[in-house]
Amino acid sequence: MKLVLQTANIVGDEKNCLYPNRAEVTSAEELQEAVKMDHVCAEYDNDYRSKENFRQSNVLVMDCDNDHTENPAEWITPEKLDEMMPDISYAIAFSRHHMLEKNGKAPRPKFHVYFEIEPTQDADYYAALKEAIYRKYTFFDDNALDAARFIFGADVGDAIWHEGWLTIDSEVEIGTPIERNDAGRVGNVIIAGTR
């Protein structure tokens, strides 16, 4: 498995759109190093992150914040993910809020799952694939399904490398786009930029 990420030269800047550093990741140790910086999972024209500049990707990231339930027994852990997806290739890096209280909610596992996919140059297909994964695995964050999503850098522990023999895109079906109401919401979630 080889995941291609693009990293920024900064950490924690949500307004940044420049990701000039290519990281070809082939191990947990390389992932752990790459995700210390803000990063994206696609290449963009002029290294400028936007859907319109999407050039290509061979990896997509899904966010698991475990905010789908307050019952700790129902929280997704790397071990549970391994049971659900034993044959699928992916890697895990913990988020900057892993096991920390946030917005008054109890500490819980929070991590990003980096799925290897067949390379694509189609931003709409890429976003549709993220929606298809969310439909099948609804514990993932439905607010992070676009083709220009960035991830805050974090240095919070060992990454996990799960080498499988399948890619996630061979395991999900792309259907119709997720319905969003007039406020940009899926259920009770407000989509970024619609407040």
Language model: regions and residue ranges:
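Extended intrinsically disordered terminal tails
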Residues: 171-172, 177-195
